[in-house]
Amino acid sequence: MLSKETRKLKTHIMLTQIINGKILTPQGWLKDGSVLISDGKILEVTNCDLAVVGATLIDAKGMYIVPGGVEIHVHGGGGRDFMEGTEEAFHAAVATHMKHGTTSIFPTLSSSTIPMIRAAAETTEKLMAEKDSPVLGLHLEGHYFNMKMAGGQIPENIKNPDPEEYIPLLEETHCIKRWDAAPELPGAMQFGKYITSKGVLASVGHTQAEFEDILTAYEVGYTHATHFYNAMPGFHKRREYKYEGTVESIYLLDDMTVEVVADGIHVPPLSLIHISEP
């Protein structure tokens, strides 16, 4: 039941008010409050659940009210893959995610050929130009990876960083916002430094990097780790010597950010607990 009590605001704009839900705020969960929205923007989050006069009410009883998800690593959706590179595939995949709480998205390509990347970039730029588009840019997961850590990548597309490829590509396109690579590869430090100078997020992924590699990579611009724990080694031994793996090395750098596939399968629940500790 909605409260019969109301409150008035001095405004002539169209308002939408979400009430009765459990609201996630930076200070924690807020029960029995409300969120006031106008023209797609949040005007107010309050612990008062009195209905605002003139506002369209949405009753969220039994539900959570949380910020929309920003999907930074996603390969497709709705039965379509961003590797297809077509507007039809992109629209179908993006629409699927928009139905499930995502509000912004970075379509992701696995290790691809340059023509495939160009096709996807062209489509991405078209979608970014649409009004109120949720597409914020293109994410390239590869193809400069360690072959031994290829995982689900396409092996024949994997190679060492090649400036004759990536420099022209970044000059021709304007939508690539993130590019993942294995920093121990020949040319990977030059690659990371260059793409960072162009405003592209350099991320460590599909790698066998040890601490010295990670430290140098961080210094030249690699500040993120792709699906942390996956396709990267932990602590290991070579002959009588022991070495920090990629995982421990990233933990040692407080300013590096990570992403995890938090399904309890790619990363065990206990590891998720460790990651989430302050």
Annotate the PLM regions:
Residues G79-E84, T96, F106, S110-M116, ...:
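Active-site loop-to-helix "anion-binding N-cap" substructures in soluble metabolic enzymes
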Residues L2, R7-A51:
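N-terminal metal-binding scaffold of metallo-dependent hydrolase/deaminase domains
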Residues G21, V35, G40, G62, ...:
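Divalent metal-coordination and catalytic microenvironments
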Residues L270-P278:
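Residue-level detector of conserved catalytic or cofactor/ligand-binding positions
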Residues T86-A89, A120-T123, D162, E240-T246:
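Charged helix-capping and loop-helix junction motifs
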Residues H75, H91-A120, S133-N146, T173-E184, ...:
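Divalent metal-dependent hydrolysis catalytic cores, especially in the metallo-beta-lactamase
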Residues L140, M147-P163, P168-E244:
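Divalent metal-binding pocket/active-site signature
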